[in-house]
Amino acid sequence: YAIDMGPWSFIHGEAAREGGEDCLVSARGLKTPRAGLSISMGNPHTVVMLGSDGKLDGLDLHSLPQVNPAPVNGTNVEFVVPVDLDVESGAQVGAIRMRVHERGVGETLSCGTGACAAAAATRFWGGEEAPDEWLVHVPGGTLAVTFVLGPDDLEHVVLAGPAQMVATVVLR
């Protein structure tokens, strides 16, 4: 299943584009604050790149990460680590592992808009050579994220992944 999630954008505009970061993020399990990049997918996200799986796995995301400056209405915070891929077809595909703290909820197993924001930030950091297709590995499974030109001439994000019927409900 796939859906066009719409265009992505920088929350802090040109300053984020020029510097590649727009805030500092503190979280339990990190010794020092890390640079983050705030991305809008229609809702706010702040993405932080970490250097190793150990750092990602060592985070305690039961507590709200602190973002300074934070977007006005708060933000979901995604922590990512790059993943090496062996792609036999020769197609260029990026891959990251992600964990997310969703505002008002805490850590969740997956977040569709978060996966899109994380791929957008990682792709931005990768520069012009970064791929348009990404695999985002979250605790709940793997999602595919693709960047395409939308009908409005903006860059849109297409999210794809498995779907499973979990209940049938009859309302009366």
Where are each of the predicted segments found?
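Active-site proximal loop and beta-alpha junction motif in alpha/beta enzyme cores
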Residues: Y1-S110, A119-R172
